[in-house]
Amino acid sequence: FKAILRDIKKLCREKKLIVDYKGDEETGNLIQRWSMGIADIIDVDADNTQIREMIREARRKKTKILVSHHLFDRMPERDEISTQFVKMERTGGDILKIACFAEKESQSYEILEAACAYTQLRNHKPIVAIAMGEEGQASRICAGDFGSVITYSCGTVPTAPGQFNAKDLSKYLDIYYERR
């Protein structure tokens, strides 16, 4: 596993390697621990029972921790999103990510505005804000304007609702940010 990660790092020298595992916590923690020291960032769920131990170990191995919170079934109110950012900040992670499902396009702005408010008021940690689902796709493109530091794409098969493939996302980002 570690050899494969090292090969990926060599192939993608210009990119950051983020390791994330969706499945049972025990297996995920094992995979993420193996990845520490090789990956640039490990994505750990905010509800992980070993989050503090994972963060301490990652620090020793010079790997950043992205603390994430996902709601695949709803978009909370702005205050709830802001409260979740503060709660995740207290874990000691390096980057804070919230991804929630948008049923309407207007809900995309709830998460983006909460992210912007958190960044302006606290500005302690880099953040990631994503509205999942087809109605949230705009957030994957414009979130940088609201303080979000990372967006996600896939190779060919989306790993989250509303996710673009890398080629399309790159094109949309170029158009949006006029980087042609």
For the regions a language model picked out, list residue spans one by one.
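Outer-membrane beta-barrel transmembrane domain signature
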Residues: 81-89, 96, 103
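Catalytic beta/alpha-barrel core
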Residues: 18-24, 39-51, 66-75, 94-105
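Short, acidic/polar
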Residues: 26-34, 77-87
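C-terminal alpha-helical cap/extension of soluble enzyme domains
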Residues: 115-180
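Glycine-enriched alpha-helix->loop->beta-strand junction motifs that scaffold or abut catalytic
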Residues: 14, 34-41, 57-67, 90-95, ...
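Generic hydrophobic/aromatic pocket-lining and core-packing "Φ" positions
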Residues: 5, 30-32, 54-55, 85, ...
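N-terminal active-site wall of soluble small-molecule enzyme domains
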Residues: 1-38
